[in-house]
């Protein structure tokens, strides 16, 4: 016997429609490339999104057509998010930090029909537009610009396009299982892979991220997604902000610590989301000018492991809760969030800090397990390390344009991470499977060593790689960026680890560099570091730390 309840479709258009109807006056603030701040509201965003959807339809676009964006976090990008997906098309966000060959590849692989771009990225598209045979139109997300038109004849001005739209356009009926948006992985090795999200997966993801034990979002919040909208849809915040009716602050291209500090204070931001390097910049800026935001209550840290020193500084100095989270493109992205349970209330400060270093527990909708190399499930005892597997409502089934059934293993997605899970379900990333150091039969976590290194007052960035070793097969090698004018030595760095890890885990050597190579999403390119420094211990007769 079936239940007798309504079955409404879970679609993206309904999110912005809800925001406009019940939170229409709530502000959406946008920092433009010029630095100018523009102000709108959810009602205006929804109206302009409908007009844009109408205009795209008049251009001949039909459901399931892909529309690419290459743009910063700004209000036009937000309008495109809702216009494209709401009309049944697929919004393909492109990371401009990819190599230009990769940008060409993903546009052609996605078979994008339209590319909408900020003027910042006009030189990139102008260089490659002749190599994009499927693209029928290029839209500059700004007012008409004669210089831009000279670079790319036929360029359409965004405001002109919206002006052609219909004020009375109504969101069409879309099946919740239809594709809504498309993101590509960072392509650390090989070409980027496409992950095609559905309306249903996106709405369910938004519901869960708003829950109290995830990000605890509400209409009273002012949300600042520092994480780019081209990086897994800004971790879903453009959708969850509309769902709860929060004020949304879009920071544009200026993501330095001083700019973010000023924006947080001026707009009363209560929650901000970004990667650790962003928060390092914010903390440095606030320490330098003595500022302290009165509104900020929590920051969400993902993308890479959050150092314990950062958690401590945010909490002890600024009274800000750090929500340590984990996810990936293939998980839309949220897989876990670290919020304490009832029995953690009485823990000591040091015990609470130790708990916060974990990436947290999966919310409803995601299941995790760890397995050994034979696929046997390992115990969730907080000690056993295994390959992390995931499944759930917003977890990938197949990569875009891949052979069906080639992505999963017995219905589970292999994340490529090595992790532990404790009896409460708290998951801790030990390393990427390809990065973990296997030394004399023991596993050494590069993540743990990097977290310790970054806590050193004279180190601003650090990476640890597995360097080949004649006796132990692999040993840890620290590659670090010193703070300006620091006279720190390799020996001093290695000695710094002495009371923090077991002796056999201490890096054999430390090398100082001007900067670490990173990919388009800010992740350190350890493959390049291994290529350059992987044999350095074979050429050295002894460890620097001996």
UniProtKB/Swiss-Prot annotation:
Subcellular location field: Cytoplasm
Keyword ATP-binding: yes
Sites where the protein binds ATP: 235, 329, 417, 434, 438, 443
Keyword Chloroplast found: no
Enzyme class, UniProt record, top EC level: ligase
Gene Ontology biological process terms from the UniProt entry: fatty acid metabolic process
Molecular function terms from GO: ATP binding; medium-chain fatty acid-CoA ligase activity; metal ion binding
Pathway: Lipid metabolism; fatty acid metabolism
InterPro entries attached to this UniProt entry: AMP-bd_C, AMP-bd_C_sf, AMP-binding_CS, AMP-dep_synth/lig_dom, ANL_N_sf
Protein EC: 6.2.1.2
One GO CC term, this protein: cytoplasm
Catalytic activity: a medium-chain fatty acid + ATP + CoA = a medium-chain fatty acyl-CoA + AMP + diphosphate
Family assignment from sequence similarity: Belongs to the ATP-dependent AMP-binding enzyme family.
Official protein name in the record: Medium-chain-fatty-acid--CoA ligase
